[in-house]
Structures are given as structure tokens and as C-alpha cells.
Amino acid sequence: MYKKVELPKGFVGVEKEVADLWKEKNIIKKNFDMNQDGEYFTFYDGPPTANGKPHVGHVLTRVMKDIIPRYKVMKGYKVIRKAGWDTHGLPVELEIEKKLGISGKPQIEDYGVEKFVTECKDSVFTYVSMWEKMTEQIGYWVDMENPYVTYHNPYIESVWWALKQMWDKKLLYKGYKTMPYCPRCGTSLSSHEVSQGYKDVKDLTAVAKFKVKGEDNKYFLAWTTTPWTLPSNVALCINKAYDYVEAKQAEGDEIFILAKELAPKVLGEGFEIVREFKGEELLGMEYEQLLPFVTPTEGKAFVVVHGDYVTLSDGTGIVHIAPAYGEDDNLIGKQNGLAFLNLVDLSGNFVEEVTPWAGKFVKKCDQQIVDYLKEQNKLFKAEKHTHSYPHCWRCDTPLLYYPKESWFVAMTTLRDKLLANNEKINWYPDNIKNGRFGKFLENVIDWGISRDRYWGTPLPIWECECGHRECIGSIEELKTKGINVPEDIELHKPYIDKVHLNCPHCNKEMKRTAEVIDCWFDSGSMPFAQHHYPFENKELFEANYPAQFISEAVDQTRGWFYTLLAISTAIFDRNPFENCIVLGHVLDKKGLKMSKSKGNVVDPFEVLDSQGADATRWHFYTASAPWLPTRFSIEDVAETQRKFLSTLWNVYSFYVLYAELDNFNPLDYKDFVSDNVMDKWIMSKLNTLVKDVDDHLNNYRITQAALEIEEFTDELSNWYVRRNRARYWSEELTDDKIGAYTTLYRVLVTLCKVAAPFVPFITEEIYQNLVVNLDENALESIHLGAWPEVDEKAIDKKLEEKMDLAYKIVKLGRSARNGANIKNRQPLSKMLLSTSELPEYYGDIIKDELNIKEVELGADLSKYVNFEIKPNLPVLGRAYGKLIPAIRKEIASRNQMELAQKIQNGGVEVITVDGNEIELNAENLLVTMQGLEGFAFAGEGSVGVVLDTTITDELREEGHVREIISKIQNMRKESGFEVADKITLYVAENDMLLDVIKKFEDVIKKETLTEEIVYNGNADYSEAKVNGEILKMAVSKRA
């Protein structure tokens, strides 16, 4: 009736068989087509780049993104799960540069832009097969046959439409600003790109001496972390509200001007203040040019100005200003009409006028500049300083802040709307809203979207010599306004650059501006561009916007999460998603960041091939909250497999084994209702589980849901099945046995449905054998079914509480046994419980589980246990020295057992002593709980248990019997006997144990299906250790 439950190739083998089944029956497509008349639940899949290999972080994002859509389909929603590929931008271009052995824009143009772009296009799916394999292997169900691709013309056209919307709203403009610039890639970057590339670096810093004009021996001291900017200095900036001084060092006659508060740190001991004054007095003072390679001809230069941003946190209180190389500097320059001196070319090298370092990369000249200043007596001091410096997020080159003409989206005008839309988003964890993400929005700057590169969505703006500009928002508009536009126009460079427009003002030809756009604009446009909106699928987009759910790694707070919100706010003034789970980083088994240089990168395929997808998924769901860092290794996943999957599998295997023996078909007992207390308890727990997990997943509490499933499965195995084994072993198919079978069957099937979104493979395997295998009318896959209904009538909270208490007492009893080093197979005479309310049924369970003869309720455990609670004097004494005697007295007045257990379990007890409210906890109290001689104790909360550990001769004999039965069962298993096989037992040599066996022969025979016991007969004996005694034993199967 049932397929035999085996794991010849482990769980990985099961998963391969299940994957084959899904393919054979087209289950994934059928799942996608479910609930066509249902309400939409919208999920957006953030697009990865397929020109790079997937890593273990991508496994995390995919398993987290998979679970909610699966769950929502089961709840009756129609869910579109469209995969996407991010195909433009620097990541692709850099790979092609490596492939071709070229570097930088000049070599690209020498190679040929058309050929280069073709190479880029051909490369974007280099690793797509690897991505598809990983996606399939982990069970991430997303439509990869019909993905959105950012380089396809329809997608680009939708992006153009978005840019045209911004143009029409006067949000898109061209400006000349100092921007973060990558000299290696030859393009400026946006603020959200820059935020992803900061690194702590140790750079050379310098305090330079700027000679006051008209003074022989007086200098301004200004500190800089970028000595390479000093040749372009045109001003010094102070804060007019601060106090400044003229001061001398202990040795020397030079007078230095700097902030008073920073003088001790800068000048050292023994300095002398010559004069003290407010910073305002310095405004307008002039100084001599520090490095006079080029003298500016326009604007003010070499003058002291004011800036609010100057602080006293470090440096000298005087900041050197080079408007060409910093946002703050540029702003100060504009406010004060300062000269603009740019001495660095687009490759990041000094121009030829800077003769000592002409043609050299500026960041490599810091030491040479410092040495030069020292030779010229213009250096006060130089030292290494660790600070955070931006690097290119793709090529890792240190960025320069460089003056460039670029196209911008005026995000600063939308700041209030961005913040308002952010308030409508539920973030998990919620501190992202007003923390990492909210702070970024508060400080938002205009988005520089143009890139001086080649492979990307072309900026659809055409310019005329007369100054007229037009933004094109569709292919149709391009064909209408363009000159000889090909019917099948390719929208990329260099083809689009050949398309000219007629200028409506002067009738000359307009040319497209050369830039492409930030590839993050592509991915941020996916809510509408994936549907080619507004040119197609208008109703589909509107029904699926905004998304109910997205999830990506924490880095995307500065990336995709931001660009989604920025574009959506600019165009629709709406939040583009409602719920977002932000994922933490994946670390190695030691908690360290994975990196190739450390050699600690875990290959996701290695883990999937050895441990399987379900184990990997379950590890990510349960190891920690999704937003916290997760340690990941093969060992971690193997432990997850053992703890949960193997437990579930063993319960399933147990059911099939005995149901097959009895030829039990649950379909014959659909309406059977069991009145067994254990059956009622597990059905109550099951329905509570269905209800709780439903609530958790509906509120995106994935880890809580998974842990509750894991706890239930543990109780199912280690309590329900363990307590009910004898019911399955009985010879007759009684109502009690039918109740045991039907209950376990219903629990397994429902548990698999609840766990299906988490572990889709093992649940399918169990469902196929328990449901499809028996019922020809069953749905052909568990993933085509609905979420199980909750039977509220089956939930009995009082029953759950009583059984949970009994289970808790049993676990405490086991703990007490372990503490006393007494096996559970050794019977004991008595257990004493602090609790006084426990029905007889549960007392019998406890006695049976713990192998105890008697349970005494409501016992005063203080008679058997030494509770000692003392103040931890180094802690409490330091805070309440004189009150210690009174604190001791107050502690002694409490119930010592309850207080001791409360503190040991992390609780807090509040006492009041002489009007002082004092919190007592594990840090300021010393607690010991030790059973007296002949007793063992364990406790948790208000529940305590004491075992009488005195072992009489009679108890010892019973212990020997239980140990012998255990050895026989192991021998049966090792011999490969079936559960129902009858055996002959051979025992020899130990007279004491042989006498015990004879005394308890009937018990041993019944427990082990032994028909005959042969004493000292001929057999192929092996030695067994029975409580320190050696017994020779052998078993043989009866004919």
C-alpha cells in the first residue's frame, strides 16, 4: 500500500526524485496558474546580474523570497513571480575589459564602441545556467522562462517613459557639480553607489603651514586627509563662532593660528598663547599660495572664509578649501565667489602644470607632496590616519570628488515626499525605517543619473547647438521626431547616437547627449518596466502596484530599495512596496565575513549537493532572524538536517512501517474520532500550530513560524510517538490502535502542508506516499493545495497546558537523572514535585517516562534540596554597601526555591530596602541548588522536581532487565530483522544476570518478541556490557 521509506542517497536523492516529479507533471507551471480568479498578491523579484556567479548570499535571498509567495498561493492569492536580470552597467563592462585585455575608456574606443557593446550584450548571460541550476536546486519557484531583462528594447522604452515623466515635471536637469568620480572607469557615481563602497583605509594626513600675507613668521595651520588636493587650494575656512589663538610652541619663534580648543593637541606641551580672539576676526585675511604651480585668474583666492560645517572634533579648526574636489568645498566656493582651480585630468592624474607630479595618479602622490612641503618649510606635521574613504563599488578604485557636468534628478525637492512614503512601508526589522534607510532619505541629495560609459540605457535627451533640448519618452515619439529612424531601431549606443532630430526652433539637427544612465535606475524601474508599462499591460501593472512584499540584503537600503522609492515617488508619488524583509550578511562558521583572500568562502553548490536544499533552507529560516548575520557552513546545515528533517522523516518512517504491517488505510476511517487524551492533545497542538504559523507568515515573522514548526515536530517525535509506541505494537486493530493511526496520519499530512512553503521537497515526498499513493482523487502535488483549515473545536488550551506541564516535568526529571549520572533504564522509587495539581493520568505518564514507581505532589522540596542565595558582593556591595545586611534579610524572607529558579532562568526579582528599589538578577546574586545526599534536583520557573536516588536490590534487578531488553533490541536491528520477526535469545556465563533473566523471563519475551531463551547453549555469542557486568548474548530469527 505504502512505498517503503528509505534514504539510500540521503535527502539529496529524495530531492532529485521530487524535482523530476515536478518536471514530469509540470507542477511549477500549475502552481503559477493557481487562483486565477483570486485577489493579487504582488511580489517583486530584485534582478541579479547573470554575468557573475551566484554565491551563498544569493541562496539566502532566494529562500527568503520564495517562502511568502508560496504561502500566499496556498491562501488563495494569485501571485505573479517574474524573474528578472540586471544586464547593464559597469559590472558588465569591467568583465569585458578583463576578457579583452583592455582597461579604461581610451582603449575601449580604440577597440570600437560597437564591438565593445556587442561583447557586453553577448556576455550578460554568461553564468545564467549556473543561476538557473541554483534556483531550481533550492526550490525557488520563479518564472525564469519569461523574465524581464533590462537591456531589451521594451524595458528600455519604459525607462525612457519614466525619464520623460521626470523631464515634464522639471525634475531632470543638467548641472555642473563636484561629484564622486571613478578615474579608472571614467564616470561619476551617484550617492547611493558611493555609499556601498566605503572602506576604512590608513592614509597619510598633513597639517600644512599657510603663511599669513605680509607677516614673516605667522602661519595658519590647516589639516587635510587628502594632501593631493593642496595644489588646488584657494581658501581657508574657519567657524566664526569659535575661539582661535595665535600661539607659539615651546621651542621656536613661529606663530601659529588655530582653534583654541585644539591647540593643546596640535602644539603639544609647553605652548604659549600669544593672543586669543573670536574666529570672526580672521575673516577676509589673506595668505600666500601654498603650492604656486598655477595661479587662478578669476574669483577670489587665498583668503579666509566662514563655514558652519567646520568642527572641533579633529584637525586644527581651519579647513583647506579646494572647490574642485569636494561637495562642501564647492558649496563654500560658490557662496564666497572663490576661484576654481582644477589640476587633475579625467584619469585622476595631475596635469602637466603640476610639474613635480605631472601625469601621476593623485592618490599615489600624497607622500611626495608631504616631502615637498617639508623641503619648502610648509609642513607642520604629517601622520597616518585611519578614516573611511569611498571606493568604486565595482572596480575598487579610490574615488575622487571631481567637477563634472552631469544630468541629475532633483531628489532634494522630493525629500518630504520620500520620507512620507517611507512611513507607509513596514520594514523588518522596523528600525530600518527611521534608522539606516530613513537617515539616508533625510540627507538625500540630487541623483546624478548620467554615466560617461557605453553599455547602459541611453539617456533619451537630444540637444541642439541653439540650446534647445528635448526628452524622448517612447520609440513612437522617436520615430515621429527623428530623421530616418530604422524600423527595428536598436536603442543602445552607438546605434541610437546615429539618430538625429530636427530642431523645431532653428531647424538644425539635434544630437543625443552621449551619456547612458545609472544602471540602478533600470532596476528601480522594474515595477512598471517589467510589464512594458504604459505601452502594454496597463491593467496588469495597476493591479500589481505597489508590491505587498520584497526582500533583499541590507546593502540595498542604499541601492534597489532606494531607487524603487525614488522613482516611484517622482512619478507616482507612492511607496512602491508595502513590506520589506531586510536580510543580514552570511558569515563563515566562526562568524567572520567570507572573502576569497581569507579562503573561507562556502560554495553554495557544495552545500546543496551534500546536505540538500531543504536543510539549507531550514538553516536560514531558523538560525537567526533574517536581518541578523547568519553563520553558515556544511556542519551547520548538517546539524539542521539532523535536528529537524531527520526527526520529521523518522516519524513518517515510523508511521509507514507499522501502517504497512497492519495494512492500514486511513481513507477507511475518515470520520473516526479518537477519545484518547494523547490524540486529543496532539490534535489541539496541531491546530494551534496551523493558526500560529498562519499568523506569523501573514506578518512576515518567518523565523518564529519555523521555530514553532520545529518545536512541534520535536514534541510529535519525542513525546507523542514515544508515549504511544505500544498502541502501534498491539496485535489487534482495536479502536485505540485505529485512533493512534488516524491521528498520526492526520498530523503528518497537515504538518507537511504547514511546512510546505519552508521545505518543499521533503513535504512533497511525504505527501506523495501518504496521500497521492492512497487516493486517486487527491491533488497531484502538495503545492497545488490550500493552506489547512483550523479546527477551533479541536483546540483545548487547558489540555495543552496540562500536557505541557507533564512534558516539562519529564524533561526536568531527565535532567535530574543526568545530574546524578543515573540512566533512565534504571528504575527509581520516588519523584517529589513542588506542584500540587496534576491529574492521575499525567502522573502515570511521568512515572512511565521516567521509570519512577511513585510521584508525590505538593512536596516541600526544601527538605531535600540545599538552596543557597547570596549577594554577589563585588556587584551589590559596590552599589549598596551599607544595605547588604538588610538585602540578605529580604532575600531570606522569600521562597528560596522559587527565587533560586527564577534567577537561574534569567528572571529578575525586585525588592525594596530602606526605600530603595533593587533589582536582583543573575549578575548580582550567587545561586546554588544542590540535592541533599540521596536526592537529585532540577527546576525551571515555578516547577521543581526531586528524585530519590537510593537504588535497592530489587530496583537494581529491574534496571538490569531494562538494559538487557535494550541490548536485545539493538541486536535485532543490527541483524536486519523486521519489526514482526520472532527470535530465539541465547545468554551465557554471568550467573547473576542469568538469574535476573530467569526471574523476568516473561517480561523480556514480550518486549522483544522472543519465543525461547536458551541458557549457556551453543551460539555465535558477542559480549554485551550490562551496567558494568559482562553478559554473552546472541539472537537468531525463528523459522
Swiss-Prot record:
Binding site for ATP: K596
Protein name: Isoleucine--tRNA ligase
Alphabetical list of PANTHER family matching this protein: ISOLEUCINE--TRNA LIGASE, CYTOPLASMIC, SOLEUCYL-TRNA SYNTHETASE
Residue interval(s) of motif 'KMSKS' region: 593-597
Organism this protein belongs to: Clostridium perfringens (strain 13 / Type A)
Catalytic activity annotation: tRNA(Ile) + L-isoleucine + ATP = L-isoleucyl-tRNA(Ile) + AMP + diphosphate
InterPro entries attached to this UniProt entry: aa-tRNA-synth_I_CS (IPR001412), aa-tRNA-synth_Ia (IPR002300), Anticodon_Ile_ABEc (IPR033709), Ile-tRNA-ligase (IPR002301), Ile-tRNA-ligase_type2 (IPR023586), M/V/L/I-tRNA-synth_anticd-bd (IPR013155), Rossmann-like_a/b/a_fold (IPR014729), tRNAsynth_Ia_anticodon-bd (IPR009080)
One Gene Ontology term from the biological process aspect of the record: isoleucyl-tRNA aminoacylation
Gene: ileS
